[in-house]
């Protein structure tokens, strides 16, 4: 679950957006999550996804979901991606504005059968895919997006370093994607490998190895 890492990120985001700390302590939030999982009958033998929503008035809402896969597995879904231009970095944070944009993009992608949205800024830097941080695999290096963040993203970065691969955190631009061998995005749902973007077709060989090595 990596509760401590998630709590630190949640606290930092609350201070950034609301200019105030969370209204609950570590111990209180951990207890509330445990009690809600137990009261809703979630089994400790299956993977459970927990969403914590914090509001400007200090309210904290917890939603528990039973999922069928390991959070750090390579997902069976291999979508194609389409380009969506964004201005401003706030939509890459886990906010209600981001969720609204994601819902719109996903609906558009389904209607047009275009897959998931690849967000890029006006300068061509790739910000996210389906709202999640991006990794591009090249012939000689594995590049984690410099604007990417998240507990799972950091775990994947450490896993690649432990594998002895040449890994860097640097800008990923649209012009780089034609040279990439694999194009991935990582979040609590797991590691997702894009199958196609534009004229480029991608593999998932390294993605599977990374998933196997995340602790």
Which residues make up each language-model segment?
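Helix-start/capping segments and mature chain N-termini
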Residues: 1-35, 39, 55-215
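Ordered, amphipathic secondary-structure segments that act as subunit-interaction surfaces
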Residues: 43-51, 61
């Amino acid at each position: 679950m990596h509760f401590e890492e998630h709590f630190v990120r949640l606290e930092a985001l609350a201070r950034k957006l609301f200019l105030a700390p969370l209204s609950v302590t570590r111990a209180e939030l951990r207890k509330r999550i445990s009690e809600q999982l137990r009261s809703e009958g979630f089994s400790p033998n299956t993977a459970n996804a927990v969403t914590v929503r914090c509001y400007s008035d200090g309210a904290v809402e917890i939603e528990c979901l039973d999922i069928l896969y390991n959070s750090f597995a390579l997902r069976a879904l291999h979508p194609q991606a389409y380009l969506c231009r964004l201005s401003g970095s706030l939509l890459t944070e886990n906010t209600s504005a981001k969720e609204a944009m994601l819902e719109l993009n996903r609906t558009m992608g389904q209607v047009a059968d275009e897959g998931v949205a690849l967000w890029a800024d006006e300068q061509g830097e790739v910000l996210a895919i389906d709202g999640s941080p991006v990794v591009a695999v090249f012939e000689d290096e594995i590049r984690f997006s410099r604007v990417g963040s998240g507990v799972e993203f950091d775990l994947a970065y450490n896993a690649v370093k432990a594998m002895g691969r040449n890994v860097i955190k640097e800008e990923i631009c649209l012009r780089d994607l034609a040279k990439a061998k694999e194009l991935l995005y990582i979040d609590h749902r797991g590691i997702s490998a894009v199958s196609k973007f534009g004229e480029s077709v991608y593999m998932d060989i390294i993605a599977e190895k990374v998933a196997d090595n995340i602790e």
